[in-house]
Amino acid sequence: MFRTPHTLQFCSVHYKTFIDAIHALQSRISQKVLCRSCSSRVSGPAKKYDVDPSQFPQENIRNFCIVAHVDHGKSTLSDRLLEFTDTIRTSKDNQQVLDRLPVERERGITVKAQTVSMVYHRPGHESPFLLNLIDTPGHVDFSYEVLRSVAVCQGVILLVDANQGVQAQTVANFNMAFCSDLTILPVLNKVDLKNADVEGVTSQMENLFGTRREDVLKVSAKLGTGVEELIEAIIDRIPSPKGDADAKFRGFLLDSWYDRYRGVIALLMAVDGTLRLGDEIISHMTGTSYTVRDLGFLNPLETPTAMLCAGQAGYVVANMRSPKEAHVGDTLSHKSADIKPLPKLEESKPMVFAGIYPEDQSQNNELRSAIDRLLLNDPSVQVSIESNPALGQGWRLGFLGLLHMDVFCQRLDQEFDAQVVVTAPSVSYKVKVHGAKNIKKYGGEMVTVNNPLHLPDRSIIREYYEPMAFGTIITPGTYLRDVTSLCVDRRGVPKSTQDVDDNTILLQYKFPLNEIIVDFYDELKSITSGYASFDYEETGYEESSLVQMQILINGKVVEELTTIVHTTRAQRVGRSMLLKLKECIPQQLYAVALQAAVGAKVLAREDIRALKKNVLAKCYGGDITRKVKLLKRHSEKQKKLRLIGNVEVPRDAFIKVLKRT
């Protein structure tokens, strides 16, 4: 490049100016450092943290969660509690502050239990209170999240919609809290609505839960009325944690999530002792040691602190690099031989199983990584590898319910951009085999079958067992006949009936789990105009009459479409599958027979007609025997093609038949 003397002079001047600026900046920095060091010698170290956990003795700590039926206002009440305690600024934009997942905001439901620490300065008290709130999901499919929350709390807010009244999940949440021996605060929400029946719903709670009428608090989470009285009741009625503050640290791993830069971030409830930066902790489940790199409160964002004391909940960043190192329910403590682990959580039992496959097999490794990351945040899902000739390699996943499965797959899509194919959901069955050789082969007399393809040969099966569920239905009395008819049609056995009030009835049935996991709730809502509610819990296995149904195409078994059904449902399910398959398989040069069979017995059949060919097109008249000869020859060719021809079933056909509707 050509440069004039003027240009060189201009560049040298600006270069000198730049160097002078750098020296000036270095001088300022050194002066600031010097001033800071001098001031620290005089007045001590500068304040590093916004919150000092040591100012909260255990008697000033309350750990509680909010439990309620779906859409009764848990998240809205959490927003008002955060605003009243000045944890967040009051704003009209504060909606579902603790619902951080995209799927939660899109569906308007809580999927993950979220923890937040609130500092409350009670009038007339010098020392502040620390209120640890856990906002829990309301749907039955996420009951494991509620169970984890209940395990570390001393009290619960039982929230009931004053407009809708007590619902089925409300009963389940009450039973869970009651069995855990927690203090229960009954609270009526949405009392500001015109149709709110405060007295009527209070009577419902009195009849079902035995609560005293004067103990029921009345709030409006939308307007914020009654929130101050609720906070005062939390402090007065819910007991403080009873850990040993002077003992060595011991904490309960409540939840965890993954950060690509810091690794695994654990959510801990400190039970005993104090945890500080730099402490060495050990996992009682894996025996691995870690060094604490960062810790603090969730307020609701991460707020670093110098320590976590007994009774407090907070996040901990140690050198956990693999998502598989964090186990929910694990005990993390200081290294010591005399520290006993805390009681473990009861493991969740998957109720619904489905196959998950990548839409493109080249994305198999990426999907495996995405599933591992989600399992860190959702340990209730069980995973095993499976292979399908039609769909390729995939995974068999166990979920707590259909909504749980829906949300899991949606999170795969939204958070990891993983497109998946989900097969039709099924439940886990059990069979009893006989014969010493067979018992040795399967490792016991009882064999659990999560995949219909893995069902042992029926000649060695002595008994079949299917999972059962205890269902609770709360419905207006005007729909009683329709609801009863639906329950009987789903093979339900009535157990009890109770009047909630003059217009509402509580029904309890025992159902086969397979009859209620897919579309029972939708049908119940449909026949009751949306007024009924439903909740269920697994009650174990019972002997049943089950069969393995196979789909045949031109006499050849298609293993991928094998399923297990009850004998009374076999024909209906078989017919439905054949109709879907018929729509998906293109016409061939020969007729194709689709059959649903149990053993040698055919239960249903559908035919795909052959493509028509006008073999008489070249005959314009003449002897009739010529036409007969051509028709006969064409018929023989079709028979031969049918015997030796392979019907190629498109991959899309398997997806449409196996995919849930």
Curated annotation (Swiss-Prot):
The keyword GTP-binding applies. The lineage of its organism: Eukaryota, Metazoa, Ecdysozoa, Arthropoda, Chelicerata. SUPFAM superfamilies: EF-G C-terminal domain-like, P-loop containing nucleoside triphosphate hydrolases, Translation proteins. This is Translation factor GUF1 homolog, mitochondrial. It comes from the Eukaryota. It is found in: Mitochondrion inner membrane. Promotes mitochondrial protein synthesis. May act as a fidelity factor of the translation reaction, by catalyzing a one-codon backward translocation of tRNAs on improperly translocated ribosomes. Binds to mitochondrial ribosomes in a GTP-dependent manner. Pfam families: EFG_C, EFG_III, GTP_EFTU, LepA_C. It catalyses: GTP + H2O = GDP + phosphate + H(+). HAMAP family: LepA. PANTHER family: TRANSLATION FACTOR GUF1, MITOCHONDRIAL, TRANSLATION FACTOR GUF1-RELATED. It comes from Ixodes scapularis (Black-legged tick).
